[in-house]
Regions:
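C-terminal accessory region of radical SAM enzymes
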Residues: 311-345, 375-422
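Cysteine-cluster motifs in flexible loop/terminal segments that predominantly coordinate metals
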Residues: 402-450
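Detector for the c-type heme attachment site
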Residues: 123-129, 259, 416-420, 430
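Conserved alpha-helical substructure of the radical SAM core
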Residues: 64, 71-210, 214-215
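Short Fe-S-cluster ligation motifs
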Residues: 146-164, 401, 438-467
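Acidic, low-complexity/disordered tracts enriched in E/D and polar residues
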Residues: 1-38
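Radical SAM enzyme [4Fe-4S]-AdoMet core and its adjacent flexible, acidic
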Residues: 228, 232-244, 251, 255-358, ...
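Radical SAM/AdoMet-radical enzyme domain recognition
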Residues: 142, 146-162, 171-295
């Protein structure tokens, strides 16, 4: 399967099945485009038939000379011989064994607080309450969750725990206790905990910063961008904005953080389709690592992203990608999460086919110890998997998630992006279509554009020119 596109002046050819990416000239681009409609995927290298070469030359004779086309075929044949063009999908058969795999729990999202000191308009957690009551996780429940993770992680050594909310800093003492407990269990069980924290920053102080810099492998700092954008969507419960209080704290934290991982994470909505300006605002504030995610909300919400918004959104990603390249070449570079793409290694096959592992390898834990496939399913009793005392008892739901992969989704099976997005978010699919094996269409279009931009950026930064 071949996917081709032009972005920011770069002609990109992606051989989907092998993962090979080629930045080519217009001639090679046009010849491959002509061939891709006539050559099927192949399990092994082959020679291009002379009759097809003649047909191609005749079709493109008004645009290119015979010599140019002949040389293009030499380059294309070399790529075919190296199995980097017109390759077959070798993973379709693998997925049958993949469905039977034994999974272990590798990561937990601990809902340390079902409470929040902000009242974000788009919050899927309903101001931290998750369709239920306000609650703070006790140390005892959190300890059982870590014990559950250790017991169900098999031979997996590296384990991940994200302190999530609501607002985790509203239960800070328990966060510290659980980190201490986790560290105390590492040597005895041959495990290594990677703790992360997501915070709105309201309660952030020097003591918390120092602890996070010592113990947290990653910290996510929630902020939506420009002051007017942030304060419209992320006010306090009394309606006042949060930007002026939070930004200085986040700047101080990022400076103290040094080269350790962190992300300033925002959400864009229908109200700020020029979200690229918010990304650049983060960069201008001095932040080096950032992400701005599209809101996912029902159509009836005034801030929801509609299908009609897509043309503007896709153009905005293109503009942001071009500015991203420009700033990197000027020595003012930053990291934008959705433009991060590893073309040489990347995730293992299982990850490429099934994504985040929700419901199998990754679970969410409520303040009272209930287990759900991920934080976005919390409160939906149809997806209650069990609790930290009994473990996973609803094996039917777990097995449904185990079967969730790109080949189980009609919309993903023949999509060029399938090995990069891994089928997308199961919660979004369920919320919009009632099935975890469907796909959220608006999200798909944005994801495909982000992948195209990320590949273009790789080509542009590898290009020594300043254009």
């Amino acid at each position: 399967m071949i996917h081709q596109y032009i972005n920011n002046g770069y002609y990109i050819v992606l051989d989907v099945n092998s993962g090979s990416v080629h930045s080519v000239d217009p001639l090679l681009y046009d010849v491959i485009s002509f061939l891709s409609e006539r050559i099927p995927d192949s399990e092994k290298p082959f020679q291009i038939a002379q009759s097809l070469k003649d047909e191609t030359a005749a079709a493109l004779k008004e645009k290119y000379s015979q010599k140019e086309i002949r040389e293009a075929f030499e380059d294309i044949q070399e790529l075919i011989d190296q199995e980097e063009l017109f390759t077959a999908d070798i993973y379709k058969n693998f997925v049958m064994d993949f469905k039977k795999r034994q999974t272990v729990v590798k990561a937990l999202c601990l809902h340390i607080a079902h409470d929040c000191n902000l009242a974000c308009q788009y919050c899927f957690a309903e101001e931290g309450e998750y369709h239920g009551r306000r609650a703070l996780m006790t140390f005892e429940v959190g300890k059982k969750a870590l014990d559950f993770l250790i017991a169900n992680s098999g031979n997996r050594r590296n384990l991940e725990v994200d302190f999530f909310g609501g607002e985790p800093l509203m239960n800070w003492q328990v966060v510290k206790q659980l980190v201490e407990y986790g560290r105390s269990q590492e040597e005895a069980h041959n495990k290594k905990f990677r703790f992360t924290l997501t915070t709105n920053g309201v309660l952030l102080n020097d003591e918390i910063m120092e602890f996070c810099n010592r113990e947290m492998a990653n910290v996510v700092l929630s902020l939506d961008g420009r002051k007017e954008v942030n304060d419209k969507m992320r006010p306090f419960r009394n309606g006042t904005g949060s930007y002026d209080l939070i930004v200085p704290k986040f700047q101080k934290f990022a400076e103290k953080r040094g080269d350790r991982d962190y992300f300033v994470r925002g959400t864009f909505t229908h109200n700020n389709l020029d979200f690229g300006k918010d990304v650049l605002h983060f960069a201008d504030l001095g932040f080096k690592k950032m992400s701005v995610e599209p809101v996912v909300a029902p159509d009836e919400e005034p801030y929801a992203i509609k299908e009609a918004d897509l043309p503007q959104i896709l153009e905005e990603y293109d503009r942001l990608a071009a500015e991203y390249v420009k700033r990197h070449k000027e020595g003012r570079g930053f990291t934008f999460f959705h433009f991060m793409l590893d073309l040489t290694q990347g995730p293992c096959v299982a990850k490429r086919l099934s994504g985040c592992g929700s419901g199998t390898e990754y679970l969410a834990v409520t303040p009272w110890g209930d287990l759900y496939p991920c934080h976005q399913f919390v409160g939906n009793e149809d997806f209650l998997l069990g609790n930290v005392d009994t473990g996973v008892t609803n094996t039917a739901v777990r097995d449904e998630f185990k079967l969730c992969n790109v080949y189980a989704k009609d919309k993903c099976r023949d999509c060029f992006a399938r090995f990069y997005c891994s089928g997308g978010c199961a919660a979004n699919s369920y919320n919009f279509h009632g099935s975890i094996t469907d796909a959220y269409d608006i999200g798909c279009e944005m994801q495909k554009k982000r992948i195209e931009c990320a590949i273009m950026i790789k080509a542009a930064l590898a290009d020594g020119s300043d254009e």
